[in-house]
Amino acid sequence: MDDELADLRRKKLEELQRRQLESQLYAAQQEQMQQELEAKKQAILRAILTPEARERLSSIRMTRPEFVAQIEAQLIMLAQSGRIRSAITDEQLKAILKQAQPKKRDIKIRRI
């Protein structure tokens, strides 16, 4: 009886250790894939943006990371489809950012 209980506990412990190892391996693989994807993304952005434009994007990323991620995704998609012929300058990036920003509502308060 004690041997069966000890055997059962040992098997359960081995199963838990195996599951934990599998989850760690899976997490490591996911992180590796994420890093590779980020490296590819940065390589494409280096190819299609001038240094000034990249600097502008990185400074905007500090305050609006979601917005910059959206712009980067659009730029990468355009580059992969062949619609970007030369490097995007800072001025061109400013125009793209201005177009992509949602329109702000002008709220005026009148006193009566």
Swiss-Prot record:
Keywords: DNA-binding. GO terms for cellular component: cytosol. Pfam families: dsDNA_bind (PF01984). One of its GO terms (molecular function) is DNA binding. Belongs to the PDCD5 family. This is DNA-binding protein Mthe_1571. It comes from Methanothrix thermoacetophila (strain DSM 6194 / JCM 14653 / NBRC 101360 / PT).
